[in-house]
Amino acid sequence: YNGDHMSMYAVNCSVPKTLVRYLVLYYAETTENKKLSEVLMDVLDTPVSPELLPPVDGVISQKTEDLVGPYELHDFFLYYMLRFGFPKSKLYRMAKLTFDGVYDDETIKKWLDKFYWRFFSQQFKRSCLPDGPKVGSVAVSPRGDLRMPSDASPTAWI
């Protein structure tokens, strides 16, 4: 939490994690610098971890998506909730159709509930968000995009 806010400028603050992966992959596949391409592909093959812990026997011990759910689901929920104001029930129905064959209904429900809980209970982190560009049509900047109390309770939404 602190490291994200101490950087003073959030260069990727409105770029979804799933899009970052595609951008890195695109650059890795199109650069003429073979060494850079290898490094970028290695980065893409490494699971995202919240801790800078060394791997134990070559295995990362803590993976973010194991804790919070797949980024593609979170980005989907966030986009349609903020951009179009869709309620939780509609997000669930849309996600079931969109991710049919990828995630079962129970998995989507589990991570949708987790998303709502985390989204509303972690608003205090946005209050001290550093400056950064708005890249897409959805952003969570407290200065112009999403105005919401820092102490919002998730119970009303879950």
Positions of predicted regions on the chain:
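ATP/NTP-dependent adenylation/nucleotidyl-transfer catalytic domains that generate, transfer
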Residues: Y1-I158
